[in-house]
C-alpha cells in the first residue's frame, strides 16, 4: 500500500454479461496490486470472468473488508452495487464501460492513468442520496427496497391509465390519472425523470422530484420537494400497476396499496478525479453547446 493512501483493500466490480471485460479488469487489478494494494473481486464478477487469483467476496463482505470499490461498467452496474454497499459507506469509483455514463465518470481509456492517482489520495469526494420505499397492503408492510435513481409507479403496456392519490407529509397533493409517477433523487433526475420532461437537479441539492408519466391533465407538472419529505402514493384505480426501483427490481401492486417513499438514512460516497465538474458531465452527455451543421440542413 502506498504510504500516503487511506486505502488498503480495493474491490473490483464488473458489468455482468459483457464480453471481453475480463481482460481489462484483470489488467487493472494487476496494476493496482503492483502499487501495494490488496485486491478482491465481487463474487459474481469473479465467477463470470473466471478469476481465482484474488479473493471473491459477496457485496456484504466487500462492505466489511474493502476500503473502496472500483466499478467497471455502466450506470446500471453502479446503481446495483451502490444500493448493496450503501449500509457500509464504501466509497465508489466509476469507470465507464457502458453507454451514457452519468455516474461512471472516468473514461475507460484513461483508467490506467487516473485510478493510481485517486488511490494515492488525489480525488474529490461527494455524497449521493438514496430513497427507501415501503409498500403497504391492508395496513401491513409487504415489501421494502432502496433506490439510487428513482421509485417508479406505472401501468403495464397493455392496460389503461392508473389513478394515483399522492400525499406529501400526510397532506393531500392531488389525484392523478396518468401512466404513472416517478419519484427521483437528484442523481435520478437525469434518468427516466429527464425523459419524462422533469428538471435536472444538481446532486448536492437537497430535494426530490415528482414527475408524472404522460398525465391526462396537462396541468399535472413535475414538482421539486424537500428531500426530508415523505411521499405516499395510493393506487385508486387501474389494472396491472407495478412499482420498480431503479428499473432493476419490481413488484406488482393491488388496488388501495400505498407506496411510501422517503430519503434513506444511507448515502453513497462517490470519488471523482480532481477537477471533476458536474456541469461538464451534463454538457458532454447531453450534447450542450453542439449545433447542427448547415451542411446537414437540406433546406438551407
UniProtKB/Swiss-Prot annotation:
Q: Which cofactor does it need?
A: a divalent metal cation
Matching entries from Pfam families are given as: NAD_kinase, NAD_kinase_C
Q: Which InterPro entries match?
A: ATP-NAD_kinase_N, ATP-NAD_kinase_PpnK-typ_C, NAD/diacylglycerol_kinase_sf, NADK
Q: Which residues bind NAD(+)?
A: 75-76, 149-150, 177, 179, 190-195, 214, 248
Tell me yes or no: is Nucleotide-binding among this UniProt entry's keywords: yes
> What's the superkingdom here?
Bacteria
- Identify one Gene Ontology CC term for this UniProt entry: cytoplasm
| Positions in coiled-coil regions | none
EC number of this enzyme: 2.7.1.23
Q: Cite the GO molecular-function annotations of the record.
A: ATP binding; metal ion binding; NAD binding; NAD+ kinase activity
What residues sit in the active site? 75
Question: Looking at the keywords, is Iron present?
Answer: no
GO-annotated biological processes:
NAD metabolic process; NADP biosynthetic process
Enzyme class, top EC level, equals transferase
Transmembrane stretches in the record are none
- Role this protein plays: Involved in the regulation of the intracellular balance of NAD and NADP, and is a key enzyme in the biosynthesis of NADP. Catalyzes specifically the phosphorylation on 2'-hydroxyl of the adenosine moiety of NAD to yield NADP.
Return the similarity comment. Belongs to the NAD kinase family.
Q: What is this protein called?
A: NAD kinase
Origin organism is Paraburkholderia phymatum (strain DSM 17167 / CIP 108236 / LMG 21445 / STM815)
Amino acid at each position: 500500500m502506498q504510504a500516503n493512501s487511506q486505502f488498503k483493500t480495493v474491490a473490483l466490480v464488473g458489468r455482468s454479461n459483457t464480453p471481453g471485460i475480463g481482460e481489462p479488469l484483470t489488467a487493472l487489478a494487476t496494476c493496482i496490486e503492483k502499487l501495494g494494494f490488496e485486491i478482491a473481486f465481487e463474487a459474481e464478477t469473479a465467477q463470470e470472468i473466471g478469476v481465482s487469483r484474488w479473493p471473491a467476496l459477496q457485496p456484504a463482505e466487500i462492505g466489511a473488508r474493502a476500503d473502496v470499490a472500483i466499478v467497471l461498467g455502466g450506470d446500471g452496474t453502479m446503481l446495483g452495487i451502490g444500493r448493496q454497499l450503501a449500509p457500509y459507506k464504501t466509497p465508489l469509483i466509476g469507470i465507464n464501460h457502458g453507454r451514457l455514463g452519468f455516474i461512471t465518470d472516468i473514461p475507460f481509456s484513461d483508467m490506467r492513468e487516473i485510478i493510481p492517482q485517486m488511490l494515492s489520495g488525489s480525488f474529490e469526494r461527494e455524497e449521493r442520496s438514496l430513497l427507501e420505499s415501503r409498500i403497504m397492503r391492508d395496513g401491513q408492510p409487504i415489501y421494502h427496497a432502496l433506490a439510487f435513481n428513482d421509485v417508479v409507479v406505472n401501468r403495464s403496456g397493455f392496460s389503461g391509465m392508473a389513478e394515483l392519490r399522492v400525499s406529501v407529509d400526510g397532506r393531500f397533493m392531488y389525484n392523478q390519472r396518468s401512466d404513472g409517477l416517478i419519484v427521483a433523487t437528484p442523481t435520478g433526475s437525469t434518468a427516466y425523470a429527464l425523459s419524462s420532461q422533469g428538471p435536472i437537479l444538481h446532486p448536492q441539492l437537497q430535494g426530490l422530484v415528482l414527475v408524472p408519466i404522460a398525465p391526462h391533465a396537462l396541468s399535472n407538472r413535475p414538482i421539486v420537494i424537500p428531500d426530508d419529505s415523505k411521499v405516499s402514493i395510493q393506487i385508486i384505480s387501474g389494472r396491472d400497476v407495478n412499482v420498480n426501483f431503479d428499473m432493476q427490481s419490481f413488484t406488482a401492486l393491488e388496488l388501495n396499496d400505498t407506496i411510501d417513499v422517503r430519503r434513506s438514512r444511507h448515502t453513497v460516497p462517490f470519488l471523482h478525479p480532481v477537477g471533476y465538474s458536474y456541469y461538464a458531465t451534463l454538457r458532454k452527455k447531453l450534447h450542450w453547446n453542439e449545433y447542427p451543421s448547415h451542411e446537414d440542413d437540406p433546406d438551407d
